[in-house]
Each structure stands twice: as C-alpha cells, then as structure tokens.
Amino acid sequence: PTPTGSSAASDVYKRQIREGMTLCGQARTVSVTHGDNSAIHAALTIINKGEILVVEGGGFTDRAVWGELMSLSSIHIGLGGVVIDGAIRDLGDLKKMDLPLFASGRTAAGPTKGGGGSVDIPISCGNVSLKPGDIIIGDDDGVAVIPFEIQNQILLSSEKKIIYEKEIIKKIKDGNTHKDIFDIKDIPIVNDDN
C-alpha cells in the first residue's frame, strides 16, 4: 500500500500492466494529440533517469501511443515508469518487461506520427491536473500525484499514517475488535429473519 496520508495527493486511477511493480519519481509530462505519439518520442530524447513519463492522451483507447519499442528504450534510459491516459499495445511483451507501466486501455491499432503534442507542460491525466516535477507514486492500487510544492508536508503526513497503521495492525493481532480500536458507537443491526 502507498499511504499518502492526505487528500492533497490526488488519485489518478490507471490499470497497471504488470502487477507487483511500483513507481515513484518526478513527472516529465507529455500531451499528445489523438493517437499521435510524436511528442512521446521527443520526450524520450530529453528525459532523465528515474523520472516518470506521464502522458495526457485524452483517455482515447482506439489508437495506442505506447508499445514494445518505446518500453525497450525507456528501460535503456532508466525511466522510473510510465503513466498513460490512453492506450498501449504489445501487451504480452510489455508484461515481461521490468518497467512500471500504467495505462487506460489497450488496442491493436498503432499510433500516427503527425508531429502533434507538447512536452513539459501542465497536463490533466485521469481528470487530475499535474505539472512537470510533481511527484508520481504508483502501485497495484493505482497512481497518485503529489504536487511538488507540498511534497514535504505529504511525506510527514505519510510517515504518521504508516506509524498509525502499524499500531492498528498490532491491536488487531492482539485480538482487539474493530469496534474497540476505532471507537465505533453501537449501530443497530436489523434482523430480517422474521
């Protein structure tokens, strides 16, 4: 689990391609035009090791903007992971690769390369706004965006949340009930067996 401890960490749900992988790093943002991955190619020439490529694809899933070749390049570069608000292809190959990858969908249809899109601009991914440099965290539960400006505040909040959850786990293992742990008031239980 990735406890962020704050609602300031906006959730961007995207399906993980290979379970068990995590990502954490600063966002490098790309906006693509419908089905055109030219801007992603441009971003891959300037992205730094460990950064997370976040692609605003408008949620379109009828043309893939990512596939096996880009994943191979990303692994070679040392990318920290990829989040795409759009479709990928070559799923069988991507599942075998050691690259954290989250996407909205998949399709067999490949991209166009018409030269559209932009790199390093504020974008919206899954209805969550983010900027280059924001912190991206992802695991089996999905992806969260932490604005760069409040990363230290979120880190402290997350540390407190982890300590709190460890205390709860200990109480559960010691045999305490949820009612006692969380100070739940008596709730009437309706019995429909009449």
Residue ranges with predicted function:
Residues 11-39:
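Translation machinery proteins
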Residues 1-5, 9, 13:
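Single conserved hydrophobic/aromatic residue that forms the stacking wall/gate
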Residues 24-26, 48-51, 77-80, 96-99, ...:
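Short coil/turn connectors at secondary-structure junctions
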Residues 43-86:
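Extracellular/luminal Protease-associated
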Residues 11, 32, 54-56, 82-86, ...:
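General beta-strand structural signal in soluble alpha/beta enzymes
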Residues 89-106:
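Histidine/lysine/aspartate-rich catalytic loop segments that bind and position anionic ligands
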Residues 176-193:
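Conserved, helical-rich catalytic subdomain that frames metal- and/or nucleotide-binding sites
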Residues 104-181:
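Acidic, glycine-rich flexible loop/linker segments
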